[in-house]
Structures are given as structure tokens and as C-alpha cells.
């Protein structure tokens, strides 16, 4: 981390594991924030769009929650304003990918095509809505918009037969933030639980051979109902994490950019720092 990580990931690592300062995390995160309050500039290493986007802003939200940022901090106030201004009233969510993504180096999965939103649906809108509610006053415009999106996202959730694990993660994060405020949280959590169980790759021999959800991608703590159901698989997943550490003490991403290996070499190095933080957090929780 000291040698190869971006300053932001190094600051996060030091904050999470070495008693480092939250102010340093916010300082480096702010360098990715644009004047409109949103985030871009390659914060999410798989697309290098400098302009603000829903996904880069979602990534910033997660990191701000990590350091317990409050609604009164400037970086959060500006972010909330961006979400209010960038909400797409026709689609009734924040567009996940836009045509501008195609203008800059990006992974194939961030390619914009017509009707691509039907693939992403409420990734990351349901989670962005939860952050809006979390960082706004009741009866404010931001709070009302957040609940408006949550209501539609929950209707979609109950109708879903299956769901990609990233979108499930969005719902998990939203439910974790809002469960004491949601009217029928038990029904919501039960549906998320059902979809997570379906999305989980339960075949250890296939982990890492294709891009998919291992148990630790969907089970986040020992209080999770799925943990008690799949404890043996979680323990196998921990063993797998230890086995896949490189000689440099980190993990490589399980995906690439297809034909664009030159730019992926840069993104890969940035992802290694992010994956190291994510996996170290998992190991701390379950060991």
C-alpha cells in the first residue's frame, strides 16, 4: 500500500487499520469532487470520465459513510446538491451510465448503449437515495426525493426473480441505513436475503475463474442470516482469500478491460489498493 496505492486508498487503509486521520481521507476524496458537487476524475478506476457521474458519486458516498461524515460537512452538502440536480425525472432515478462514459478509457461493462439502464436498474440509485435520506433533514427536498426513489426501488425489488450481486449490495446498503425508518423492513430484508442466496456462487472450485459473487460478497457480518446458513462456505471463502494473496501481499482483480490492456494496467494498479482494503475488512470481521 505504501509503495503503490493511490493517496486516497493509503489514507483509507491508515484510517481503518492503523489509527489514521479521517480528515486525510476526506482531503484526498475531495480532490475527486467537481464544482457541481458530484464526483468523477477516475475515482472509480474502471472509467476515467472527468465529469461527475452517479457511480463515482456512489463510490464517494460509501467512503464518506466509512469515516462517519455528517450532513453538515461541506463535501457532503455539495454532494447532496449534486444528487438533487442530476436526478433524471423521466427515468425517475440517477442514470448509471451516460454517453459521455464512452469518450474516455473505460472497462467494457461501463460502455453506454441505448437502453443500457434496463441492465443496471437501481444500481446505484437505491443506495444513493438512502444516502440522500441519511444526510438530509426530514421534510427537506432531498429527503422527499430520497423516499420517492426508495418507494419505486422497493416495488421493483419485490417483483424481481433474480438480481446481479452488485445491485443486491446496493439494496443491502440501503436497508442497513434505513431499516429503522422503513415501514415493512422484515419483508424487504427477506426479499434481499432470497435474492442474495440465489446470486451467491456456492461452488468453491469455481471462485476466481469467472466474475461472480462469492459468499463474502453478499454476507457482510456474523449477524447476517445467511452467515448462519452458509457458515462453512464463509470459512472456505476466508481460506480462499488467504490462498489468493500474491507474493506482494495483495490481490489482483478478477476482471480486465478486454482489448484495452494498456489502460487496464493503470486501472489494475489502482484496483489492487481498493481490493486490499475490501478484503482486509472482510478478514477482520470474520476471523
How would you name each of these model-derived features?
Residues 1-287:
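Preference for long, amphipathic alpha-helical scaffolds in soluble/luminal domains
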Amino acid at each position: 500500500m505504501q509503495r503503490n496505492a493511490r493517496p486516497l486508498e493509503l489514507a483509507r487503509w491508515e484510517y481503518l487499520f492503523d489509527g489514521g486521520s479521517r480528515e486525510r481521507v476526506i482531503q484526498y476524496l475531495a480532490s475527486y469532487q467537481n464544482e457541481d458537487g458530484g464526483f468523477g476524475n477516475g475515482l472509480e478506476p474502471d472509467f476515467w470520465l472527468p465529469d461527475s457521474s452517479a457511480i463515482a458519486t456512489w463510490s464517494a458516498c460509501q467512503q464518506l459513510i466509512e469515516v462517519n461524515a455528517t450532513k453538515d460537512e461541506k463535501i457532503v452538502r455539495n454532494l447532496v446538491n449534486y444528487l438533487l440536480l442530476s436526478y433524471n425525472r423521466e427515468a425517475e432515478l440517477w442514470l448509471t451510465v451516460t454517453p459521455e462514459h464512452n469518450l474516455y478509457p473505460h472497462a467494457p461493462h461501463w460502455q453506454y448503449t441505448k437502453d443500457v439502464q434496463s441492465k443496471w436498474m437501481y444500481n446505484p440509485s437505491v443506495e444513493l437515495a438512502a444516502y440522500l435520506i441519511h444526510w438530509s433533514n426530514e421534510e427537506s427536498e432531498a429527503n422527499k426525493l430520497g423516499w420517492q426513489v426508495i418507494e419505486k426501488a422497493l416495488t421493483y425489488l419485490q417483483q424481481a426473480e433474480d438480481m446481479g450481486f452488485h445491485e443486491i449490495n446496493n439494496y443491502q446498503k440501503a436497508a442497513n441505513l434505513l431499516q429503522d425508518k422503513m415501514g415493512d423492513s422484515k419483508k424487504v430484508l427477506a426479499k434481499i436475503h432470497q435474492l442474495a442466496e440465489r446470486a451467491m456462487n456456492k461452488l468453491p472450485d469455481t471462485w476466481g475463474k469467472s466474475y461472480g459473487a462469492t459468499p463474502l460478497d453478499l454476507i457482510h457480518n456474523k449477524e447476517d442470516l445467511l452467515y448462519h446458513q452458509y457458515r462453512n462456505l464463509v470459512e472456505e471463502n476466508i481460506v480462499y482469500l488467504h490462498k489468493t494473496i500474491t507474493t506482494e501481499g495483495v490481490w489482483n482483480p478478477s476482471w480486465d478491460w478486454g482489448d484495452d490492456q494498456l489502460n487496464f494496467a493503470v486501472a489494475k494498479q489502482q484496483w489492487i489498493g481498493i481490493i486490499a482494503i475490501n478484503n482486509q475488512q472482510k478478514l477482520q470481521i470474520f476471523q
